[in-house]
From Swiss-Prot:
Top-level class of the enzyme under EC nomenclature: hydrolase
Lineage, opening ranks: Eukaryota, Metazoa, Chordata, Craniata, Vertebrata
Distribution of this protein across tissues and organs: Expressed by the venom gland.
Cofactor mode of binding and number, as noted: Binds 1 Ca(2+) ion.
Species: Austrelaps superbus
Name assigned to this protein: Acidic phospholipase A2 S17-58
Propeptide residues, chain positions: 20-27
Amino acid sequence: MYPAHLLVLLAVCVSLLGASNIPLPSLDFEQFGKMIQCTIPCEESCLAYMDYGCYCGPGGSGTPSDELDRCCQTHDNCYAEAGKLPACKAMLSEPYNDTYSYSCIERQLTCNDDNDECKAFICNCDRAAVICFSGAPYNDSNYDIGTIEHCK
């Protein structure tokens, strides 16, 4: 396991906030962080992912720089799809008020059956991202790569 994976939390969250073409569904930073900690225990700061690759951080464009950056791109795209669901429309206006229900048992994440359609979709976006992060190495050379030059 790669202890730096917890750092993905902030990058993904900032990426969602900074991308103008991605609607913002329910996003509970603490909840997503706990999901990451369930699968990838770590006590490191999120700052190393604030400017990682082309998608882990504010905005997102171009070709992902590596597997980890593809995880961030996929997560961004998943949230964009959530924004198209009729069930998510009401949630989009109050993105921080609702959280989904999930469980973490022996480092296994499960989105619970009591979620409504939108919460279930978002929970599965986050779950898939965390699983992706857990299998993707952190490449120091993709930190602060200069998105203007490398992410076209």
